[in-house]
Amino acid sequence: MSEDHVNKLTADIFKALAHPVRIKILQMLKKRTYCVCEMMEIMDVEQSNLSQHLNILKKQGLIDSEKAGQRVNYHIVHPCVAELIEVAEKLIGE
């Protein structure tokens, strides 16, 4: 894979992270799996809005979902995603 291609893919990941709602989703998912209904309650966002944010994160391979009956549960795909959020929090002193 060329360096330019890797740089574009890296930029795409950072674009996916570039929204406070998506950061909040990842902060929640680094603790445990959540379904959409739980996230809606905690975050006070509309389902359509939340679904758009989840799809952006999923498209970049940062999260994945698993159907459990009527529920769709989301989780972080790789521990380094949580580590990336933690590094950003350290940079701002949180």
Give the predicted meaning of each segment.
Residues 1-6:
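Short, intrinsically disordered or compositionally biased N-terminal tails of bacterial proteins
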Residues 8-48, 61, 68-79:
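N-terminal helix-turn-helix DNA-binding core of bacterial DNA-binding proteins
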Residues 48-50, 59-60, 87-89:
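Short, intrinsically disordered/low-complexity patches at protein termini
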Residues 53:
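Residues within the DNA-recognition helix of helix-turn-helix
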Residues 56:
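Alpha-helical DNA-recognition elements
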Residues 73-94:
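Conserved segment of winged-helix/HTH DNA-binding domains
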